[in-house]
């Protein structure tokens, strides 16, 4: 099975207007990503406010995204839930709609054992024929995969990758030493992309690339061509942006940044709130200093 989980994957925001999906803005957002040749887009992840979506909205979001992308790049759907039955329904619907793969985290809040995490993903694996990326986000889910559970899950034929949002930079080395050769490891933290890939990562699921996909793509291309100096120069330039985009809970800052650049409304669903005035000012200053334009 072809492994689509590599390179630059943008964790897309979900645009809303008047508390409904803004499908016109969605088209602008996706076409901006296609224009700058990202390797894939992730729809309905945590950056996409997936927990705020009804099942019908989730379906509409995926269906519209598939139509807009029209097979130009792979689409990865988010299928995380603390209810295994509901997560299976998301995975089954993703398969039916025609996405190219999906990502899921361990069930949040309920704090399953490692065996429970394994059984959750085994159930998702059984319900579809799509490639799967594990999503390690312990600060969000409250629980994480052990290295042993990752190894065990990697033996299932369609579990092909791990997105790691942790800060243990030794982890990709440990995982790489035990898993099958075609199992990919990607970082979900913009600020550690180079350090992570130096330790065995093969890509990056990025929040910042919602607004600077061209610069993020250039960074990875330089890294992959062994132009370490060039990659570091770009990374250093982007560090203030990475900081600004996490000055408040993701996706609050990136939603405002996208709005400021004309991609969508600055509408975010409760319990999240729009960016504070100080956060807005910080984001505006960084966008101006980097001369970011859409």
Swiss-Prot record:
Catalytic activity: L-aspartate 4-semialdehyde + pyruvate = (2S,4S)-4-hydroxy-2,3,4,5-tetrahydrodipicolinate + H2O + H(+)
Entry keyword annotation includes Acetylation: no
UniProt name for this protein: 4-hydroxy-tetrahydrodipicolinate synthase
PANTHER family (alphabetical): 4-HYDROXY-2-OXOGLUTARATE ALDOLASE, MITOCHONDRIAL (PTHR12128:SF66), DIHYDRODIPICOLINATE SYNTHASE (PTHR12128)
Subcellular localization(s) per the UniProt record: Cytoplasm
UniProt superkingdom: Bacteria
Organism the protein comes from: Rickettsia montanensis
CDD domains attached to this UniProt entry: DHDPS (cd00950)
Family (UniProt): Belongs to the DapA family.
Its biological purpose: Catalyzes the condensation of (S)-aspartate-beta-semialdehyde [(S)-ASA] and pyruvate to 4-hydroxy-tetrahydrodipicolinate (HTPA).
GO biological process, one term: diaminopimelate biosynthetic process
């Amino acid at each position: 099975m072809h492994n689509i989980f590599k390179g630059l994957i943008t964790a897309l925001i979900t645009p809303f207007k008047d508390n409904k999906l803004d499908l016109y803005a969605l088209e602008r957002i996706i076409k901006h990503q296609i224009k700058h040749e990202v390797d894939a887009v992730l729809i309905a992840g945590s950056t996409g406010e997936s927990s705020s979506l009804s099942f019908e909205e989730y379906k509409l979001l995926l269906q519209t995204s598939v139509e807009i992308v029209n097979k130009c790049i792979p689409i990865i759907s988010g299928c995380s839930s603390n209810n295994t039955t509901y997560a299976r329904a998301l995975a089954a619907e993703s398969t039916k709609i025609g996405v190219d793969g999906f990502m899921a985290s361990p069930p949040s809040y309920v704090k399953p054992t490692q065996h429970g995490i394994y059984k959750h993903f085994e159930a998702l694996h059984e319900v579809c024929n799509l490639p799967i990326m594990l999503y390690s986000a312990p600060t969000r889910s409250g629980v994480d995969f052990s290295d042993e559970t990752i190894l065990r899950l990697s033996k299932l034929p369609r579990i092909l990758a791990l997105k790691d949002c942790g800060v243990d930079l030794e982890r990709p080395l440990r995982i790489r030493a035990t898993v099958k050769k075609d199992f990919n490891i990607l970082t979900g933290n913009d600020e550690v992309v180079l350090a992570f890939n130096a330790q065995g990562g093969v890509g990056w699921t990025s929040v910042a690339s919602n607004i600077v996909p061209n610069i993020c793509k250039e960074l990875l291309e330089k890294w992959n061509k062994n132009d370490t100096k060039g990659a570091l120069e770009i990374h250093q330039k982007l560090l203030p942006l990475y900081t600004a985009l996490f000055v408040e809970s993701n996706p609050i800052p990136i939603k405002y940044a996208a709005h400021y650049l004309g991609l969508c409304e600055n509408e975010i669903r409760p319990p999240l709130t729009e960016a504070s005035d100080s956060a807005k000012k910080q984001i505006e200053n960084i966008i101006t200093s980097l001369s970011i334009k859409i």
